Structures are given as C-alpha cells and as structure tokens.
From Swiss-Prot:
It comes from Colwellia psychrerythraea (strain 34H / ATCC BAA-681) (Vibrio psychroerythus). It is found in: Cytoplasm, Nucleoid. Its main location: cytoplasm. Residues 87-108 are annotated as: Disordered. This is Nucleoid-associated protein CPS_3743. InterPro entries: YbaB-like_sf, YbaB/EbfC. Belongs to the YbaB/EbfC family. Homodimer.
Amino acid sequence: MMKGGMGNLMKQAQQMQAKMAKAQEELAQMEVVGEAGAGMVKVTMTGSHSVRKVELDDSLMEDDKDMIEDLLAAAVNDAVRRVEEQNKDKMGALTGGMQLPPGMKMPF
C-alpha cells in the first residue's frame, strides 16, 4: 500500500516538473512593456529579463541627459516588475497557490 502511494506521489512530482518546464518556456517567450514619464520612455523585455527594445518619445531629445537616464532606469525597473508579476501569476497557477518561504523560487 505504501509503495503505491509513493509511486503516485513521484508521478505527480514528474507531471508538475513537466508543467513547470513548459511554463518557464512560455514565460521566456512572453514580452512586457515597462513605461516611465507617462509613456515617453518604453522598454520591452522578455520573461527572461532580456531587453528587446527601448523607445524614446521625440520630445525627450530636447531634454537633458540626466532626465533621460532617470526615465530609462525607471522604465527598465517597471518592466522587471511586470515580468516578476507574470512569473508569479504563472507559477502560482501551477503550484495551486502553494506558498513558498520568502526568497525561495520555483523550480527548486
């Protein structure tokens, strides 16, 4: 009886691992757009945190360099935050809302 229960548990773990691998692939293909300055700076980032595109509104070219740098940093940070939200939502759906200890990420 114990053997069957352990086998079933292992099967479930393998299924979850396969689902998580698929979800990670999907997340890597996903793109989000982070914005700053009311959309004057946009950064497109993949789910694996690769920046694909940076867009600057033409009106920024008249402004100072420091402001542009600040807006770029803010847009990148916004994109990172959005990627993390997508990752959390996707992985949370797979784990059935199982709460992990702080700092622990899936997969283990």
